[in-house]
Amino acid sequence: MFDIIKAVIIGIVEGLTEFLPISSTGHIDLVNHVIKLSQSQDFINMFEYVIQFGAILAVILLYFNKLNPFSKPTAKARNATWQLWAKVIIAVLPSVVVGLPLNNWMDEHLHTPLVVATTLIIYGVLFIILENYLKNKNAHITTLADITYQTALLIGLFQVLSIVPGTSRSGATILGALLIGTSRYVATEFSFFLAIPTMVGVSILKIGKYLWQGNGFSGEQWAVLMTGSIVSFLVAIVAIKWLLKFVQTHDFKPFGWYRIALGAIVLLVMFI
């Protein structure tokens, strides 16, 4: 019963932070240091990533018509949707090439409060610096159609940075997109779309690794996994709608300051 309650809390954290540029994995790592599940470490490692699938389902639900080429009434519209998917796949490729070989090493060595706190602060500072730089500049990529295949690849290269815990997948992609001239709204939406193949792939990889190690799922573990995923799905719907509305009238500096403050608090707790 206590693990179900913990799964609800972790699911809320995941749903709130997956698409905000503040690192969902970093937040979950920190939460797990306070209310760690009473399960094996193998299950916990898998759980942290697989509940992200619930958040991804929120994107699929909210953008189903926009991302479904078969729902388009004209050949031109269908072709535009297929092109968008092609750009998403191109953007994901760098993470596949770099992330897969380093996955196990990252899990074993970098999931620590010190690493999370450090990356929270570094990218918080970068967001503030970048937003100050962009203050009087106009974006030249203002629609998803404006994103070229080359631009998609560049954004995908930035996503590779998120393999370090605390960086934030959405944060890295949004930061990169802003840097190359994408509007905040389009950068945010494209980051959502990149999450679909990226996190579905990671979830499958983590489940496969968990089973390959000879583990199975008890009834309680299934309940914990489903609870966390469902809660993250529901909360992510709210978070996505809120973020899209927020970026239409605000920049990302508040997230930068939040990252710096949280990172500093973690460091203080560690060393005091």
UniProtKB/Swiss-Prot annotation:
It is an enzyme of class 3 (hydrolase). The chain crosses the membrane at residues 2-22, 43-63, 82-102, 110-130, 185-205, 224-244, 252-272. InterPro entries: UppP (IPR003824). One of its GO terms (molecular function) is undecaprenyl-diphosphatase activity. It is found in: Cell membrane. Catalyzes the dephosphorylation of undecaprenyl diphosphate (UPP). Confers resistance to bacitracin. This is Undecaprenyl-diphosphatase. It comes from Lacticaseibacillus paracasei (strain ATCC 334 / BCRC 17002 / CCUG 31169 / CIP 107868 / KCTC 3260 / NRRL B-441) (Lactobacillus paracasei).
